[in-house]
Amino acid sequence: MPKRILCFGDSNTFGWIGSLEGPTHRFPSDIRWTGRLTALLGPDCEIIEEGLGGRTLRDQFTVGSGVFVPGAGLCGKDYLPACLLSHLPLDAVVIMLGSNDMKSALNRSEHDIAEGMAELADIVLKFPWQELLDYPRPRLLIVSPPLIGARKMELAGERYVDAPRKSRALAALYKKIAESRNAFFLDAASCLTDEPAGEAHGPDGMHLTEHDHELLALGIAGKLKEILSLR
């Protein structure tokens, strides 16, 4: 049976194409980092995409997100249990969230955001589905999101006050969460080597470009091979 890997995230898992105006599209599946995992990991792995624009770790709304779903639908903490149960069995879960939580309207510090990630990690690692379904728990890979830099602040700085500093603090906090739970960690910023390094390079300063998706896929694939003992 193929290794089943759930990728849970926001618009950068969905494959949102950054745009400065008007409706946009998502990258095709073979361009998105999730789709590239299929090619990189081979036929012995099945990738399950669960990306939603505007998703937060534990807030039930995202002001000005432009996403037309009820507020609770954007809350990772509320949605994740049903998501896990609907996709069992799972061998690994990859979570990359935190960018939307840095919006000024939510008033979340970097420590608040990290606490939200800890709650999601505990759902994956402690949720009692084994009372009903006899499947082992998946391994967990926590991914800190790309950095927020000058480009995003030029375009929407009032919506992301202090976000550059917060985004640079998350990697260390997320790593501690992973280490304390026998989970795994990857810093997405370490994969994004184009200048300015560590940031998403879309025109809106928030979303990944095609090359960013390629680089991130390589980093995550390498980590999953380690986690799942894949060749």
Question: Where are the language model's segments positioned?
Answer:
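Phenylalanine-focused residue identity feature
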Residues: 8, 14, 27, 61, ...
